[in-house]
Amino acid sequence: MGCFFSKRRKPAQGGQQQGASQEPAAGEEKAPQYSWDQRAKVDPKDYTFSGLKDETVGRLPGRVAGQQFVIQDCENCSIYIFDHSATVTIDDCVNCQIFLGPIKGSVFFRNCKDCKCIVACQQFRTRDCRRLEVFLCCATQPIIESSTGMKFGCFQYYYPELALQFKDAGLSIFNNTWSNIHDFTPVSGENNWGLLPENAVVQDYVPLPASEELKAVRVSTDAMKSIIPITRGQRQKNSDESCLAVFFAGDYTTANARKLIDEMTGKGFQLVQTKEVSMKAEDAQRVFQQCASEFIPLLERGPVVALEFNGDGAVEGCRNTVNDVFNGTKVFVSESKASASQDVDNFYNFADMQMGM
């Protein structure tokens, strides 16, 4: 294979060779400038916490800005990443309290033990971990491997920049499979994971940051303020009556869904699960059945947001609330207790297949 050579430039008049830093003479072309030449240099140290002990450290909003982050060999530390990132790896950490803002890709815990965490991500995985307690928002099914004593709860957190960080990370606040754990290495007769108590207090696990710098982030762990709706997930339902409500894409879809959640939970009903997903006409036929023709034209606007509520009288309560609060807005709501369970199954079976593609 040959080599490419360029001719050596002749010395300028007067015997001086032209320096590389001089401007090109008239008529000569400038060397092309590429975007990657002008990109700011990334210092890995700015995106790494390594070898720390008994420290409180973190990154403020805007300081990570979608980069990869590494946490390793930390002991008895409180770590707060108040920003979105691409991926996060956490290796060989012991007795740490960790908050991780929205992660566009995966978070991977390896060989960690006795850590308490709050995490939002696209993919969650652990390997060779023991006794992790995690308040989780995960868009796909979380996976544990060779890990024991794992406990999970629903992500519950707020600070003013968090909603935009979820958007920047490409995560929907309605897609959270926090309790649907897949154990890659199950042991016969044992259960390597379980759920945190339903009344678990987030700050008892991951306290608010104590350092003056990190206190500037206005954090709340109040369930009513949480960016992620608090769902029951796979906890046992209190009633055999559920109801499906589906909002269609529009300017106020998220706000309307949050409003219905507030109204229904305020009346004592429980939010079991939520989902945001795109639908086609044939999907609507299967899910909405005889009502499909009414909703198919709305599917072109974008993804739908579905909510499952549970509790005695959930269908009547949801229909009355939608009529009172969202009059004039097209919303699918189960028609009766008899049809509601099938509505829920039809939608979430479709959604699980769609998300798995």
From Swiss-Prot:
Alphabetized UniProt keyword annotations: Cell membrane, GTP-binding, GTPase activation, Lipoprotein, Membrane, Myristate, Nucleotide-binding, Palmitate
Gene3D superfamilies cross-referenced by the UniProt entry: 2.160.20.70, Nucleoside diphosphate kinase-like domain
Biased composition (Basic residues): 1-11
Compositional bias per record (Low complexity), positions renumbered to this chain: 12-25
Reported modifications of this chain: Myristoylated on Gly-2; which may be required for membrane targeting.
A GO BP annotation: post-Golgi vesicle-mediated transport
Residue numbers binding GTP: G105, S106, Q122, Q123, F124, R125
Subcellular location: Cell membrane
Lipidation (N-myristoyl glycine): G2
GO molecular function, one term: GTP binding
Pfam families: TBCC
Main location: membrane
C-CAP/cofactor C-like domain span: 32-186
Coiled coil spans: none
Residue ranges, annotated region (Disordered): 1-39
Function according to Swiss-Prot or TrEMBL: Acts as a GTPase-activating protein (GAP) for tubulin in concert with tubulin-specific chaperone C, but does not enhance tubulin heterodimerization. Acts as a GTPase-activating protein. May act as guanine nucleotide dissociation inhibitor towards ADP-ribosylation factor-like proteins.
Family: Belongs to the TBCC family.
Protein name, as recorded: Protein XRP2
Organism in which the protein naturally occurs: Gallus gallus (Chicken)
Lineage: Eukaryota, Metazoa, Chordata, Craniata, Vertebrata
